[in-house]
Amino acid sequence: MAVQVENTPVNKPVEVGNETALLLKDLKENGDYVNSKVFPSLIKASIVNESLGKNILVIDLRSTNEFTEGHIKGAVNKKFSELPSYFETGIKPFEYDKIILVSEDGQISSYTTCLLRLMGYGNVYSMRWGMSAWNNRYAQEGWLKGVSGKYETKLENTVNERPSSNGMPDLRTGLQSGPEIGTTRFRKLFEEGTADIFITADEVFSNPQKYYIINLDRKDKYEDGHIPGAVRYKPEGTLGYTDEMASIPADKPVVVYCGTGHNSGFATAYLRLFGYDAHTLKYGNNGFMYNKMVKQRTALSWLPFTQAEVNNFEVVK
């Protein structure tokens, strides 16, 4: 069954499946997180460090070996797949002022934070830059190794038009209420894990035509140079709007990218919730046009990862 959903007075109604409409309605009525002032929910390492010993919980999503070799004092180590049950029965989430997710470079924690926020946990944050911002050891192993200017000469300035709206993926859970549909979709995403979430610049630039590429950034940044074929979507006013989302192909792999991979991680979580085969580009623009970002940092307010982002905070074993 198709349902017409009209978001704005100027755009024609978009037909979406009944389950999609119910889930959209439920998320909108419960805070419309992706269009709120707290989206994306990122927190600086310096604030996390200042908050240690206070009423916060740090959840480290890295592997057991990485956690054992060194972690933030007081942090607990949890696998991505364990989080739903941990939040339901392992802790009382709302007794904490903040729950902070930490990963190697802030990419997985951004994706995960969005899912948990959409599930109703409104005090969850992702630590920006991940452990790379905590001290130099992790920066050398993470972000400073990940930045690259490898494809700066492969960018284009063409303004690529969006395709016509073709609806959104059918969710097909067989359920008839927004909350039930959401619960089933969240469970599925956590069961699927994170192995298929990320994509690298090498993969994208080797065959950009294979993907529908979404540039999630300002117009001036997009027009100054972007991945060939990329289509710009506004960082605000895209997610949750069917007239925007319906132009994203449901039958093609989708790559979402921004400056750092943080915002695109949040957006990718939302798109995957609604059935898109979406992937976030690891490190964002930092992973393929880093030198250009550094040179134009002031002119276009880019956010390249530099040594200035790295702190000297201690870890414990």
Would you name each region that the model predicts?
Residues 1-42, 68-98, 107-196, 222-253, ...:
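Rhodanese-like catalytic fold shared by cysteine-dependent sulfurtransferases
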Residues 36, 49, 54-57, 61-62:
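Mature N-terminal segment immediately following signal peptide/propeptide cleavage
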Residues 46-54, 203-207:
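A short acidic-Thr-Gly-centered motif at the start of a beta-strand
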Residues 57, 98-100, 212, 253:
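Structural motif
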Residues 57-62, 75-78, 212-216, 230-233:
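Short hydrophobic beta-strand that contains or immediately precedes a catalytic carboxylate
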Residues 102, 257:
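Short, surface-exposed ligand- or partner-binding patches at beta-edge/loop junctions that are enriched
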Residues 207, 216-220:
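A mid-sequence, solvent-exposed acidic-amphipathic segment
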